[in-house]
Swiss-Prot record:
Organism name: Drosophila melanogaster
Family: Belongs to the diuretic hormone class 2 family.
Main location: secreted
GN (gene name): Dh31
Described function: Regulation of fluid secretion. Stimulates Malpighian tubules fluid secretion by activating the apical membrane V-ATPase via cyclic AMP of principal cells in the main secretory segment.
Protein name, UniProt field: Diuretic hormone class 2
Length: 116
């Protein structure tokens, strides 16, 4: 039974090797001429320049319009900092939290084992 399985596995392996060796790889795009004089296919060469310029101006206008809409928006994030005294209080609170979380910030200094 094991000889039969071994023969079958060997035959299958031989078949796979023959199938792989007979397959030819597809040529690289730069190697195939494809009727383009050996230069390969370039998608940008077929797009007219006026179309590209039109697309660029349209995208430019869209970006400028989006930036202006963002600058003129009434709904900005200010965390209440522009509301007088309460905004100043909030700013001081946030600065204190940032200082407390900073490694060299206020508070008791921790000594390392080498300083003792």
């Amino acid at each position: 039974m094991t000889n039969r399985c071994a023969c079958f596995a060997l035959a299958f392996l031989l078949f796979c090797l023959l199938a792989i060796s007979s397959i030819e790889a597809a040529p690289m795009p730069s190697q195939s001429n494809g009727g383009y004089g050996g230069a390969g296919y370039n998608e940008l060469e077929e797009v007219p320049d006026d179309l590209l310029m039109e697309l660029m101006t349209r995208f430019g206008r869209t970006i400028i319009r989006a930036r202006n809409d963002l600058e003129n928006s009434k709904r900005t994030v200010d965390f209440g900092l522009a509301r007088g005294y309460s905004g100043t209080q909030e700013a001081k609170h946030r600065m204190g939290l940032a200082a407390a979380n900073f490694a060299g910030g206020p508070g008791r200094r921790r000594r390392s084992e080498t300083d003792v």
